[in-house]
C-alpha cells in the first residue's frame, strides 16, 4: 500500500471511523483515522485558504485553514517524517464525494521545500506556484476525475457542465517532480504548502473533503476510496 501523510479538510463526519461529529481538519499518518483533529466551520460557497508547515527541528506538522472573515481552525501534531515517509516523495491534493457531494475546487497552490545538509552547507530547495491552472497543465499528474482549465481552476472531483457537483467521485493532482523530503545528513528539512479552495454544495451535508498529501512517488488512487476515504486510503483501518 502507499505511504501517505495528509492534512484533511473533512466536511462530513464519519463517526464510525473515528471522525468527530462535526466538520474538522485533521492530520493523517498512514491512516484515514486522524491522529489529531480540530473543529472547522466550513463555509459553503466561500473561498478559504489552507496553510501547512513542517520543520524537522521541531518535528511538528501544523495546518491553519482560514476564511477572509477571520474564521480559522488550527491543528498540529508532533511527528518525525523521516520515520514515516521515503526519502523521495510526491506532493498532491486529493478530494472525494460520496452519497453526499460538493465541489472541490482549487484556485491556487504553492509549495516550498528546503533541505539543509551538514556536509556541504548547501540548501536543496523545490518551489512551485500555481496561481491558475491551464487546460493542458503539463507539470501536474492528474488522477481519477481531476481536471484543469475550467475558469483557470483545478476541479478535483466531477462537476457537471452546469457546475453541479457529482456524487461518488474521486480525483487527485500531484506535482510532476519528486521532492527530496529528507536525508540522513540533513540538518534541517522543512516545507510549507498553501492552497486556496472553494467547497460548494447544494446538499445540507457537503461531503467529503479535500486533503493535501505527501506520498511515495508512484502513488495512485486506491480502488474504492471515494467518500470518506478521500482518495487516499484503501480502507478505514
Swiss-Prot record:
<feature type="binding site">
    <location>
        <position position="24"/>
    </location>
    <ligand>
        <name>Mn(2+)</name>
    </ligand>
</feature>
<dbReference type="InterPro" id="IPR013320">
    <property type="entry name" value="ConA-like_dom_sf"/>
</dbReference>
<feature type="binding site">
    <location>
        <position position="70"/>
    </location>
    <ligand>
        <name>a carbohydrate</name>
    </ligand>
</feature>
<feature type="binding site">
    <location>
        <begin position="98"/>
        <end position="100"/>
    </location>
    <ligand>
        <name>a carbohydrate</name>
    </ligand>
</feature>
<feature type="binding site">
    <location>
        <position position="208"/>
    </location>
    <ligand>
        <name>a carbohydrate</name>
    </ligand>
</feature>
<protein>
    <recommendedName>
        <fullName>Concanavalin V</fullName>
    </recommendedName>
</protein>
<dbReference type="InterPro" id="IPR050258">
    <property type="entry name" value="Leguminous_Lectin"/>
</dbReference>
<keyword id="KW-0479">Metal-binding</keyword>
<feature type="binding site">
    <location>
        <position position="10"/>
    </location>
    <ligand>
        <name>Ca(2+)</name>
    </ligand>
</feature>
<dbReference type="GO" id="GO:0030145">
    <property type="term" value="F:manganese ion binding"/>
</dbReference>
<dbReference type="GO" id="GO:0005537">
    <property type="term" value="F:D-mannose binding"/>
</dbReference>
<dbReference type="InterPro" id="IPR000985">
    <property type="entry name" value="Lectin_LegA_CS"/>
</dbReference>
<keyword id="KW-0430">Lectin</keyword>
<comment type="similarity">
    <text>Belongs to the leguminous lectin family.</text>
</comment>
<dbReference type="GO" id="GO:0005509">
    <property type="term" value="F:calcium ion binding"/>
</dbReference>
<feature type="binding site">
    <location>
        <position position="19"/>
    </location>
    <ligand>
        <name>Mn(2+)</name>
    </ligand>
</feature>
<feature type="binding site">
    <location>
        <position position="228"/>
    </location>
    <ligand>
        <name>a carbohydrate</name>
    </ligand>
</feature>
<keyword id="KW-0465">Mannose-binding</keyword>
<feature type="binding site">
    <location>
        <position position="14"/>
    </location>
    <ligand>
        <name>a carbohydrate</name>
    </ligand>
</feature>
<keyword id="KW-0348">Hemagglutinin</keyword>
<dbReference type="InterPro" id="IPR019825">
    <property type="entry name" value="Lectin_legB_Mn/Ca_BS"/>
</dbReference>
<dbReference type="GO" id="GO:0005536">
    <property type="term" value="F:D-glucose binding"/>
</dbReference>
<dbReference type="InterPro" id="IPR001220">
    <property type="entry name" value="Legume_lectin_dom"/>
</dbReference>
<feature type="binding site">
    <location>
        <position position="8"/>
    </location>
    <ligand>
        <name>Mn(2+)</name>
    </ligand>
</feature>
<feature type="binding site">
    <location>
        <position position="10"/>
    </location>
    <ligand>
        <name>Mn(2+)</name>
    </ligand>
</feature>
<feature type="binding site">
    <location>
        <position position="19"/>
    </location>
    <ligand>
        <name>Ca(2+)</name>
    </ligand>
</feature>
<keyword id="KW-0106">Calcium</keyword>
<comment type="function">
    <text>D-mannose/D-glucose-binding lectin which binds alpha-methyl-D-mannoside, D-mannose and D-glucose in that order. Also binds to serum fetuin and ovalbumin. Has hemagglutinating activity towards rabbit erythrocytes. Is not toxic towards larvae of the brine shrimp Artemia. Induces relaxation in rat endothelized aorta. Shows a transient edematogenic effect in rat.</text>
</comment>
<comment type="subunit">
    <text>Homotetramer.</text>
</comment>
<keyword id="KW-0464">Manganese</keyword>
<feature type="binding site">
    <location>
        <position position="14"/>
    </location>
    <ligand>
        <name>Ca(2+)</name>
    </ligand>
</feature>
<keyword id="KW-0840">Vasodilator</keyword>
<dbReference type="Pfam" id="PF00139">
    <property type="entry name" value="Lectin_legB"/>
</dbReference>
<keyword id="KW-0838">Vasoactive</keyword>
<feature type="binding site">
    <location>
        <position position="12"/>
    </location>
    <ligand>
        <name>Ca(2+)</name>
    </ligand>
</feature>
<dbReference type="GO" id="GO:0042311">
    <property type="term" value="P:vasodilation"/>
</dbReference>
Amino acid at each position: 500500500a502507499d505511504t501517505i501523510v495528509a492534512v484533511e479538510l473533512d466536511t462530513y463526519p464519519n463517526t464510525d471511523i473515528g471522525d468527530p461529529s462535526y466538520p474538522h481538519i485533521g492530520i493523517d499518518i498512514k491512516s484515514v483515522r486522524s491522529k489529531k483533529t480540530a473543529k472547522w466551520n466550513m463555509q459553503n460557497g466561500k473561498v478559504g485558504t489552507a496553510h501547512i508547515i513542517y520543520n524537522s527541528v521541531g518535528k511538528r506538522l501544523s495546518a491553519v485553514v482560514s476564511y477572509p472573515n477571520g474564521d480559522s481552525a488550527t491543528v498540529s501534531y508532533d511527528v518525525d517524517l523521516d520515520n514515516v515517509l521515503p526519502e523521495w516523495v510526491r506532493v498532491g491534493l486529493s478530494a472525494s464525494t460520496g452519497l453526499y457531494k460538493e465541489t472541490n475546487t482549487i484556485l491556487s497552490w504553492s509549495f516550498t521545500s528546503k533541505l539543509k545538509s551538514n556536509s556541504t552547507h548547501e540548501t536543496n530547495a523545490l518551489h512551485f506556484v500555481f496561481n491558475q491552472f491551464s487546460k493542458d497543465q503539463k507539470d501536474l499528474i492528474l488522477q481519477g476525475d481531476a481536471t484543469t482549465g475550467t475558469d483557470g481552476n483545478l476541479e478535483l472531483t466531477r462537476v457537471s457542465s452546469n457546475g453541479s457537483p457529482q456524487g461518488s467521485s474521486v480525483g487527485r493532482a500531484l506535482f510532476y517532480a519528486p521532492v527530496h523530503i529528507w536525508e540522513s545528513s540533513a540538518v534541517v528539512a522543512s516545507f510549507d504548502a498553501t492552497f486556496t479552495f472553494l467547497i460548494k454544495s447544494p446538499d445540507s451535508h457537503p461531503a467529503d473533503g479535500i486533503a493535501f498529501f505527501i506520498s511515495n512517488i508512484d502513488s495512485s488512487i486506491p480502488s474504492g476510496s471515494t467518500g470518506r476515504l478521500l482518495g487516499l486510503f484503501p480502507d478505514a483501518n
